Amino acid sequence: MEAGEGKERVPKQRQVLIFFVLLGIAQASCQPRHYSVAEETESGSFVANLLKDLGLEIGELAVRGARVVSKGKKMHLQFDRQTGDLLLNEKLDREELCGPTEPCVLPFQVLLENPLQFFQAELRIRDVNDHSPVFLDKEILLKIPESITPGTTFLIERAQDLDVGTNSLQNYTISPNFHFHLNLQDSLDGIILPQLVLNRALDREEQPEIRLTLTALDGGSPPRSGTALVRIEVVDINDNVPEFAKLLYEVQIPEDSPVGSQVAIVSARDLDIGTNGEISYAFSQASEDIRKTFRLSAKSGELLLRQKLDFESIQTYTVNIQATDGGGLSGTCVVFVQVMDLNDNPPELTMSTLINQIPENLQDTLIAVFSVSDPDSGDNGRMVCSIQDDLPFFLKPSVENFYTLVISTALDRETRSEYNITITVTDFGTPRLKTEHNITVLVSDVNDNAPAFTQTSYTLFVRENNSPALHIGSVSATDRDSGTNAQVTYSLLPPQDPHLPLASLVSINADNGHLFALQSLDYEALQAFEFRVGAADRGSPALSSEALVRVLVLDANDNSPFVLYPLQNGSAPCTELVPRAAEPGYLVTKVVAVDGDSGQNAWLSYQLLKATEPGLFGVWAHNGEVRTARLLRERDAAKQRLVVLVKDNGEPPRSATATLHVLLVDGFSQPYLLLPEAAPAQAQADLLTVYLVVALASVSSLFLFSVLLFVAVRLCRRSRAASVGRCSVPEGPFPGQMVDVSGTGTLSQSYQYEVCLTGGSGTNEFKFLKPIIPNFVAQGAERVSEANPSFRKSFEFT
């Protein structure tokens, strides 16, 4: 148990030891450091080295922003931060600075700003013997009755010496004579008062006047001296000395009393009569300050104010007044004047450190260091400091009337960029006086705001076939910061789609956000694309944001209709067969066309442009179906050529033509063959034979037709494609998107016709297929062909 307690005592003892060490350090920093210098020392003279006294390293004073702060507006000292030397800024006159006060001490502070630390110091000004004793009156007149008995003392005017200490007035001597010797007496104030002592009786008839030289000596090395003539007039006997009613008068007078105010009235009486009883009043042992401040009436003894009083300069006056009768006898009294302090001085504020510009987002940062003072006393000299309540700053009291102005909360330049702070110092006097000091603190910008786009996304419309470098739109971002922190630079961000060639499509002006199309856009190749743009400021570090830009390409009518069927590529044309017995409205074929554009630019209309037999055929305007318009006649030519115009609804409209060949046949017994010109006669002769063969073939083929129909349906369902024989079919490539046509007349599914003609010796074969509809899936399909996709007929002729 004891061992454990011993172990616990050791940390406690250490804690107590550390506490006392820290307490000693704190007291050491508060105790002033003392320095001294002789008065009248030349400016720039060395006083002390603060670097050594404060225990700091070389260069630390400059880094910590050391400075010397003293009361008042006059700087008596200069300080070298680099060397730490404290030098005199000017010659110092101790008498001017301190007057009779001894010791003469000038307090000052050594202020270290970073971190904040104060050191108290005092500069004592040592007196030098630079003033000689001076008598205010070069001639001192004494009227002494001849009846005065030996041993009587006479107080004479003392000399003034502005020096203090050993350099002040120390001794008086009188010239050798038979009647008087000199006696020195110390007053309560420590002043040496010279007195003449009568050695033997005077005889006016023997010597009516005595002249003596009074010499005042100071204690300097070498000593200085001053002389005055003491002239003694021996008068007739006057055996009564004037007596004052009181030996001590105590009065109080406010410091704001006007000039001419009555301070006091002294009164003395003399029992003698005649001239020996006539009393006159005069100052005795009065200093120059008393003579300047007060005026004494020689007849009435009224003490009046000659000039304004100032409590802050002198608080009390001791006035010696002498009453002298006509016979030369005199008595003295003392008037003790106490100046009453009034609150006539407003507080004073001295700014030591001020930082006018501070970055935002800082907290607990020092803005200013200042001191306050009030020359008044008591409550008149007590002060309180304050600033406005609605500011993010607070005042922190320091040592000996020093205050620091500190940031309480982080500043935001975007909310407020400038603060006008009024520091108010008020005393507790009546009435209360105050001093206001205004400072302006500018908040410098920190890059704490990223650029913000005016929109999170932008939609731009560009018509296709635009010219390269076309301005297609703009993006805009703003930054709440200022200066370079608010300068925004725009850029294109890498696209999310790796296959999008963004760098070749658009560019952006880095300064103003203008977007340009780098190439001519094609709606049919690219209808829309999107990308991201970034906006970055030029702060450090730079902040950025991004926005989405969507570009929609508007279609232009730059594609003509494309005819899918019948194919117009120069190959052998397909020939449509129409029986002569066809009724009006018989579907001959259908012109199928598409348009690569969109919208109304892809709305197609059809019209019959040319025909071998006008009025025989008609074309439906919206779906391109070619139908018979009337019954066929015998005189109608067997070969019909139709030109169908396909036109879109664009502005201006574009068009294409399709050429159809129609063969009019009497039933399907004999196809029309391109034979030599000599064949028509023979064909007419064999017309009956053809009809018979057709009838026989029809009957014979009924069975085969059923079988073929079943097989065709099976094959179509499996392969989803039409069986193609030796015939003229649409050839050549066409884009898949051309099949995708809305309900504007262009089919959503393809028609395919087969016409096969085979010529040979004695055998002719004709095959007619109804439209075969492949399994194409297209957008916007309007309808499906009315014909059965699996329907097939086959006719054979021999």
From Swiss-Prot:
Gene3D superfamilies: Cadherins. The keyword Repeat applies. PROSITE patterns: CADHERIN_1, CADHERIN_2. SUPFAM superfamilies: Cadherin-like. Residues 1-30 form the signal peptide. Residues 31-692 are extracellular. Keywords: Acetylation, Calcium, Cell adhesion, Cell membrane, Glycoprotein, Membrane, Repeat, Signal, Transmembrane, Transmembrane helix. InterPro entries: Cadherin-like_dom, Cadherin-like_sf, Cadherin_C, Cadherin_CS, Cadherin_N, Protocadherin/Cadherin-CA. The modification N6-acetyllysine is found at K299. Residues 37-135, 136-244, 249-349, 354-453, 458-563, 570-673 form the Cadherin domain. It is found in: Cell membrane. It comes from the Eukaryota. Potential calcium-dependent cell-adhesion protein. May be involved in the establishment and maintenance of specific neuronal connections in the brain. This is Protocadherin beta-2. It comes from Homo sapiens. The lineage of its organism: Eukaryota, Metazoa, Chordata, Craniata, Vertebrata. The gene is PCDHB2.
